[in-house]
Amino acid sequence: MNWDVRYAREGYLFGKEPAAFLSREAARIPQGARVLSVADGEGRNSVYLATLGHDVRAFDLSHNAVAKARSLAAEAGVEVAFNLSGIEKWDWTQPVDVIVAIFIQFQGPEARAATFARFREGLAPGGLLLLHGYAPRQVEYGTGGPPHAENMYTLPMLRDAFGGWEVLHEADYDALIEEGSGHSGQSGLIDFVARKPAG
């Protein structure tokens, strides 16, 4: 997948509005929290978080996506610390209060396990993880995401990956989403919100 090519198209591939999941769950985030939006794309989620008053940093590996994200932030009149980076290159030693990871299912099982380990490292004690993506049946729907069931999430997988964390919300459901041309139609979805132990 060449994300720079995908994001070079005119307009916003996933729209300008935040993911419906994030709109529903953002109230859990403490005011003024240090938030990291992972593989943020064109900025729809990070910009929304900044409008809520959070200290937001975000990264994506696509030059075109980051440029569009900066334009979206300027349009909204907010500041986001945008960075050009992939998950593997990001400095996870600088802890944040909240990690937001939405539709990052371009990784297979091995890379995903490494990413989840980075999340466990990069989140401050007592911090929140807001994770949202597709369930394996999404491959049959074909309305977004890669055509690889092994890249998708299940709730047992996520409970295992973040064992010992307090699960605040989890759901496995189908819904009609309209989030730009990239995510459009009936979809098999997973929500997972958990708090890292404070100790």
Positions of predicted regions on the chain:
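A short, conserved alpha-helix within the catalytic core of class I
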Residues: 106-119
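Short alpha-helix
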Residues: 150-171
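Conserved class I S-adenosyl-L-methionine
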Residues: 1-30
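Conserved beta-strand signature within the Rossmann-like core of class I S-adenosyl-L-methionine
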Residues: 126-134
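A short acidic, Gly/Pro-enriched loop at the edge of an enzyme's catalytic core
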Residues: 90-98
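Conserved SAM-binding loop
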Residues: 69-70
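Conserved SAM/SAH-binding beta-strand->alpha-helix loop
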Residues: 62-64
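Conserved SAM-binding strand-loop segment of SAM-dependent methyltransferases
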Residues: 75-88
